[in-house]
Amino acid sequence: MLPAAMKSLGLALLALLLCPSPAHGLWCQDCTLANSSHCAPKQCQPTDTVCASVRITDPSSSRKDHSVNKMCASSCDFVKRHFFSDYLMGFINSGILKVDVDCCEKDLCNGASVAGRSPWALAGGLLLSLGPALLWAGP
């Protein structure tokens, strides 16, 4: 009966890995940089539901300078309200600045991801390690 117990335990572990877990907080890339892509992962506050990436460019500049802001946020609307404030709108409407806001809801989705954080990668690793034992146990 031990092989059946191992099989049940393996299936239970697999189910835990494949089900979304609200217990951990969202992780986002966090930085404010000019012409760089080096950001650090940051665990967001429980009230933050999105990762945001904001790119501010000067379309008239021949140097193509830009500023990149990556952060945790409570909503994409909040980020847009912040970056499209009355102060910046004058520059945006006159064509001096261009602001692009992108939001997403998965860990580290606003920048380079960290290897091995995907639940599918974890599930695949579990199947590769437990698969032979489950097959050996048989029905």
From Swiss-Prot:
Q: Which residues form the propeptide?
A: 111-139
Point out the signal peptide segment: 1-25
In which domain of life is the source organism classified? Answer: Eukaryota
Q: Which UniProt keywords apply?
A: Cell membrane, Disulfide bond, Glycoprotein, GPI-anchor, Lipoprotein, Membrane, Signal
UPAR/Ly6 domain: residues covered: 26-113
Instruction: Give the UniProt record's GO annotations in the biological process aspect.
Output: acetylcholine receptor signaling pathway
The record places the lipid (GPI-anchor amidated asparagine) at 110
Q: Name one Pfam family in it.
A: UPAR_LY6
Q: List the disulfide bonds.
A: 28-51, 31-39, 44-72, 76-103, 104-109
Instruction: Name the glycosylated positions.
Output: 35
The tissues in which it is expressed are:
Strongly expressed in brain, also found in lower levels in eye and reproductive tissues.
Q: Where in the cell is it found?
A: Cell membrane
Role of this protein: Believed to act as modulator of nicotinic acetylcholine receptors (nAChRs) activity. In vitro inhibits alpha-3:beta-4-containing nAChRs maximum response. In vitro inhibits alpha-3:beta-4-containing nAChRs maximum response. May play a role in the intracellular trafficking of alpha-7-containing nAChRs and may inhibit their expression at the cell surface. Seems to inhibit alpha-7/CHRNA7 signaling in hippocampal neurons.
The name this protein goes by in its record: Lymphocyte antigen 6H
Name the gene that codes for it. Ly6h
